[in-house]
Amino acid sequence: MKKNILLIFLLIFLFSRCKNIENNSDNENDNENSPIPTQRLSVNDFEYIGAFRLPVEGEETVNSWQWGGFALTYYPEGDKSGANDGFIGSLFGTGHAWEYRISEISIPKPVNSKNKNLSELPRAKTIQDFRDILNLSDYEIPRVGIEYLPKQAGQSSAKLYFCFGQHYQETSDLTHGWCELNLSTPQKKGDWYIDTSHHEYCTNDYLFEIPKSWADKYVDGYRLATGRFRDGGWSGQGPSVFAIAPWKQGNPPSNGTKLNHKVLLKYTSTEDYDQPQHKMKNYHNSDEWQGAVWLSKGDKAAIVFVGTKGYGECWYGNEDGPCLECDNRGWWSTELKGVLLFYDPSDFVKVAEGKSKPYEPQPYAIMEIDKYLYHIKSKQQKDHLGAAAFDRERGYLYIIEPYVDDDKPIIHVFKIK
């Protein structure tokens, strides 16, 4: 009899544990009660771990990683059968830059190759093949961001959020949506947009998670950050950040919905030449900000933009100097470097509370990382870095370096100490 009672209690305990795991599968890493950090992260808080290569399937087609790597997000529940090596979860990312199809890959244990030998790096494995979720084949030089979030209020499952645009986007196009994590049956929903000046250039190139405790306290639970920097400053003379929460406007919001938003960072567009020119310190029109992440570790945090920064003189023309009729025409600087640009979350608090204007926050630190990169061949090389993603629980920062491995990117890994 006692054995039967013990068995019943054991079964009840195991059942409750299974239900908890099931219920939490879309909500892990939410850290709902975690305190809001009060200190800044510094460049000395980062340790370089190494890098890894991406899968080779589909080469020479749009279903490959070649010329890709400009959107990335971390999925903590991915790759459940992966190696027990401390690198838990998976990554969703975009491939070939013509169509930005989405794939899911494993995260192998990175290797720090002292001689930057690609053959020493492990290779990720494909978990989900590339799928054409966004249908961007008609876009000229597309721009895309993606971000995973666990299920939010009113949702029955976690979502993969996306934003998209193109280099020249003069109409008020729709820019945002979401889909399911199963890429073969994505159930894409959208599209929506953010109604702000120059929204087609300042809202739709990167997405990142806002920590729940911060979002709940300062921006009414708007947990998704979105933004874009468009070279030449059409978007604003520096990166931008808008907090959004599409799930608060329907499950899903109807097609064409104007998303409610909260501006956290926005500088003056160069198109608004008749207004006061508020810009980021040391701004160059040649700057590139391909990704952004809200980093946190213990009592320290920072909003970090990942990209390529101009130094010295800046001009419109080609690498040799100003010109209007020349090859490689665009914005150039004397030197370009791959960097991480740090903003203080407390400055965003002031904006959210109406105590500062969205153009007032300024970066407090910059971290140059070219010494870790594999493909830098000239001081004016563009596209040093692609997108970024963050494993908040373990403190791993994943940063893409494009065009390294037969035109495929590799992924570098840093750990916040």
Specify the residue positions occupied by each region the protein language model found.
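N-terminal processing/targeting junctions
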Residues: 13-17, 78
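Sequence/structural signature of beta-propeller domains
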Residues: 31-417
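Bacterial Sec-dependent N-terminal signal peptides
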Residues: 16-36
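Sec-dependent N-terminal signal peptides
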Residues: 5-13
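Functionally constrained cores in energy, signaling, and assembly domains
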Residues: 4, 17, 354
